[in-house]
Amino acid sequence: MPTIVEELVRKKCAPCEGGIAPLTDAQVAPMLKGLSGWQRDGIKIVKEYKFKDHYQAQAFTNAVMWVSHREDHHPYLIVGYNTVKVEFWTHAIEGLSENDFICAAKVDSLLDL
């Protein structure tokens, strides 16, 4: 039986232009629990990645941008010398949607390559 993360990685983000409610705490909890290192921060999910140097941080940032472009769901990124902070939330609903967790799982999977 696949894990929640494996299921999320297989999914594709659905267009969201509003008109739906953000996920409830009960819906968020199992997905957040399945994602390693992600934290809820109000209406966002957030994770900070650390790398050996700036080159690795920048390469990871480019890979995150590739994932977000393919999914048409874009994070807020804060890039430091050897860190990248990634924040996902669904702007159209001012909260969390399944798209945020799909992208978080896909971003995490970049490090498994």
Curated annotation (Swiss-Prot):
SUPFAM superfamilies: PCD-like (SSF55248). This is Putative pterin-4-alpha-carbinolamine dehydratase. It holds the Pfam family Pterin_4a. Its EC number is 4.2.1.96. It is an enzyme of class 4 (lyase). It comes from Thiobacillus denitrificans (strain ATCC 25259 / T1). Keywords: Lyase. Belongs to the pterin-4-alpha-carbinolamine dehydratase family. CDD domains: PCD_DCoH_subfamily_a. GO terms for biological process: tetrahydrobiopterin biosynthetic process. Coiled coil: none annotated.
